[in-house]
Amino acid sequence: MGAMAPRTLLLLLAAALAPTQTRAGPHSMRYFETAVSRPGLEEPRYISVGYVDNKEFVRFDSDAENPRYEPRAPWMEQEGPEYWERETQKAKGQEQWFRVSLRNLLGYYNQSAGGSHTLQQMSGCDLGSDWRLLRGYLQFAYEGRDYIALNEDLKTWTAADMAAQITRRKWEQSGAAEHYKAYLEGECVEWLHRYLKNGNATLLRTDSPKAHVTHHPRSKGEVTLRCWALGFYPADITLTWQLNGEELTQDMELVETRPAGDGTFQKWASVVVPLGKEQNYTCRVYHEGLPEPLTLRWEPPPSTDSYMVIVAVLGVLGAMAIIGAVVAFVMKRRRNTGGKGGDYALAPGSQSSEMSLRDCKA
């Protein structure tokens, strides 16, 4: 099972990627599945994508030349042919289920079959620090909007509208919740254990964040301080701004944790402060890759005058060091020659240069 993602999948992605991980737990597995009907074509396009700890590890696309489940993470290549054949057959079964479901939904909503319609499913499970089931998920969306979802008790359903009530009644009569509950509590957990074991070098690693604060002028005597955390893994991280030691939860702008594209994540949090009061504000960074939380302030660059003074001092010190070295060398030569000038032989090929210099009189 799995998913793709045109813009309509953002609804499910936001819900599914919200839980983050620590190495002891929790860990997560998600499958996103999307079927899109196409005018003039009997079969919808079906795409399934699997994620472990927010990392893609398998994919199926019915429009591929040879539709099969394929590995999307190096550690999945250790699975044998029987695994891929079994998962491919499951995906093809799901493809047919989605085709029938799309047709039913057209009737529920009194829609024409001539347009393009989208049905999506997100399913998966989270493990706690004891590696037991923390929560199971099963959610459906139609045309990019919530349709029906299995509640956290894994026994009851929440239907989003009148059409979804039809599906809810059918599934209650057939005992669908019991079927999904058994999968989420059993097979989902067992496979997640297996994937975490196979991919432990990648999935169970810890990369500590690299953090810094940037300064952005605003109008009316204000500036924005932005605290950045880059290159961290896993995705679970906390950034907070403090004013004189007190947290500014209400006045802080915080973006969602984002993939960096290299297997790590990035995040920032900003706060607007009065110009000249920047040093009263500190950013705190909490991540399991850090031995202790980081505390950062904005570090103003040195002024031009200070910079010139530093350069001048360094220049004087450098010149003094060179002069000292020359004097020491000359004194040593004089001691070695009894106080007389040393014999300096010209380097080969330097005769003409020496003659021309000697003939240049004032």
Swiss-Prot record:
Changing residue 55 to R: In K-less, no effect on ubiquitination. Disulfide bonds join 125-188, 227-283. It is a single-pass type I membrane protein. Residues 209-297 form the Ig-like C1-type domain. The modification Phosphoserine is found at residues 353, 356. One of its GO terms (biological process) is antigen processing and presentation of endogenous peptide antigen via MHC class I via ER pathway, TAP-dependent. Polyubiquitinated in case of infection by murid herpesvirus 4, by the viral E3 ligase K3 (mK3). This modification causes the protein to be targeted for rapid degradation by the endoplasmic reticulum-associated degradation (ERAD) system. Ubiquitination occurs on lysine, as well as serine and threonine residues present in the cytoplasmic tail. Serine and threonine residues are subject to ubiquitination via ester bonds instead of the usual isopeptide linkage. Residues 299-309 are annotated as: Connecting peptide. Residues 1-24 form the signal peptide. CDD domains: IgC1_MHC_Ia_H2Db_H2Ld, TM_EGFR-like. Belongs to the MHC class I family. This is H-2 class I histocompatibility antigen, D-B alpha chain. It comes from Mus musculus (Mouse).
